[in-house]
Regions:
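Chalcogenol-based redox active-site neighborhoods
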Residues: 1-163
Length: 163
């Protein structure tokens, strides 16, 4: 069953953002476009490259009214250390969301139960909290965040009133 055009299920978790721990909920995702980028775990091979890519494109996401959220099955404490020790991850100005209970990874269909990790998944959610795009692939395949930005631009164009 597809999750496209379904509402994000209720959740509450913690994130590391702008040097502090913050709570992130399904309500946090409302009122603006949200891009959830799921990664297997902190300190894994491709993740810093993808986070750096997202950081380099972050201003463009913000121009579209979108917030980026990186999600792994680690805790927000792990994300703090990751942010402080990895030059690439340290560029992130967006929340690094912990999902140690696998609430989000299960809700979005990216949980790998036998490993306790997430598949690489990217989801664009509208300001009402409805999932508009979903892309999931094997953890061996790194993503190009500029492609996600392109999708956000297309969605943004389609919803803007024509003047």
């Amino acid at each position: 069953m597809s999750i496209i055009n379904t509402a994000v299920q209720p959740f509450k978790t913690e994130a590391f953002h702008n040097g502090k721990f913050v709570t992130v909920t399904d309500e946090t995702l409302k009122g603006h476009w949200s891009v959830l980028i799921f990664m297997p775990a902190a300190f894994t091979f491709n993740c810093p490259t993808e986070i750096e890519d997202a950081a380099e494109n972050y201003a463009e996401f913000q121009k579209l009214g979108a917030e980026v959220y990186i999600v792994t099955t680690d805790t927000h404490f792990s994300h703090k250390v990751w942010h402080e020790t990895s030059p690439a991850v340290g560029k992130a100005k967006f929340p690094l969301v912990g999902d140690p209970t696998h609430t989000l990874t299960n809700a979005f269909g990216v949980h790998i139960p036998e490993a306790g990790l997430a598949l690489r998944g990217t989801f664009i959610i509208n300001p009402e909290g409805v999932i508009k795009t979903a892309e999931i692939h094997s953890n061996e395949i790194a993503r190009d965040v500029s492609e996600t930005l392109r999708k956000c631009m297309i969605i943004n164009e389609k919803i803007r009133p024509i003047i």
